[in-house]
Amino acid sequence: VYTPEPGGRWSRRALALPDNATIGIVDTDLHSDQAFLDVDSFLTPSSLWYADLGAGTLEKVKTLPPKFDAAGLRVEQLEAVSRDGTKIPYFIVHRNEIKLDGSTPTILTAYGGFQVSETPYYSAATGKLWLERGGAFVLANIRGGGEFGPAWHEAGLKTKRQRIYDDFAAVAEDLIARQYTSPARLGIRGGSNGGLLMGVEFNQRPELWGAVDIEVPLLDMMRY
């Protein structure tokens, strides 16, 4: 929370909101420091929070019912290093007792375009059909998206598009190096611009993937 101070300065204070979550402003009061926030994460369904920004207090008002058992699951945010040395953050959701021997079936996804920010979100299907059964899920924040501002987006435009594909491959290589998974156990998925990403990865780095799910892709870029 940023507060104006005398002399044109601003002070800031952190709110104790959940880590590794997507926070959105639902509504505010023009005549007070009160607001309602939406909090969404990989393991917790969307919840409504009341915030008194002046007092710095938070209260969870209500939460949608859970659709899968998140007990024993955890979320980490890690970084891979792309070909040009840029650090590429990614989220991984997995069981607490994961074996670091490359045996965990893993789904890796990303978008990487149009300033779209890929942030934590609750997916009943992913949780029930994949995470509950021992799989890991990875969301990569590659360049081309809007997660870290205009420069992050512009770093993957036009003649710099290859950086996006290098970023995605770097995340896969990092997962394999950390032994979360292995090429035979690593599947990738993406749609639309993410489908184009999958098509490129399938052709450029086929040795990294055990399965590729290409959804509504833009593949014929010469006539697009």
Which residue stretches match the model-derived regions?
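C-terminal closing repeat unit and adjoining cap/tail of repeat-based domains
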Residues: 2-5, 33
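Short loop/turn segments that connect beta-strands within beta-propeller blades
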Residues: 4-8, 53-54
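Beta-propeller fold detector
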Residues: 10-17, 58-64
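Serine-hydrolase catalytic core recognition
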Residues: 23-224
